[in-house]
Amino acid sequence: MPNKQFRVERLAQQIQREVDDILLKRVRDPRVNGVTVTGVDVTGDLQQATIYYTILSKLASDAEKTQTGLDKATGLVRSELGSRLNIFKAPEIKFVRDPSIEYGSRIDELLNELHKNNEL
């Protein structure tokens, strides 16, 4: 079964590259500007793909608008994926905001603050 896992990982990487390109070049919705695809999880049967993304803004309203824009663009992204990927059926896709970038940024802030306090 390691061969199947390799295929799933390879497909996830290809989906990440293609979705990033599709969002940049094909989706014209201004709510989707500044979106970076950080990762993709594909189920073992290749039927569903969860696409993780981040945005530059930290405002909650921008996050909601971006999620709405991505939800509206799901059909276009899936049809483009179907034409670009060499697979029988394009997976159902779901966009999820990736909290790990903000979490890492918060940890950096806390460490810097701790470092400044130790220097005093």
Swiss-Prot record:
GO terms for biological process: maturation of SSU-rRNA. The gene is rbfA. The keyword rRNA-binding does not apply. Belongs to the RbfA family. PROSITE patterns: RBFA. It holds the Pfam family RBFA. It comes from the Bacteria. The keyword Cytoplasm applies. It is found in: Cytoplasm. This is Ribosome-binding factor A. Monomer. Binds 30S ribosomal subunits, but not 50S ribosomal subunits or 70S ribosomes. It comes from Limosilactobacillus fermentum (strain NBRC 3956 / LMG 18251). One of its GO terms (cellular component) is cytosol. One of several proteins that assist in the late maturation steps of the functional core of the 30S ribosomal subunit. Associates with free 30S ribosomal subunits (but not with 30S subunits that are part of 70S ribosomes or polysomes). Required for efficient processing of 16S rRNA. May interact with the 5'-terminal helix region of 16S rRNA. Keywords: Cytoplasm, Ribosome biogenesis. One of its GO terms (molecular function) is ribosomal small subunit binding. InterPro entries: KH_dom-like_a/b (IPR015946), RbfA (IPR000238), RbfA_dom_sf (IPR023799), Ribosome-bd_factorA_CS (IPR020053).
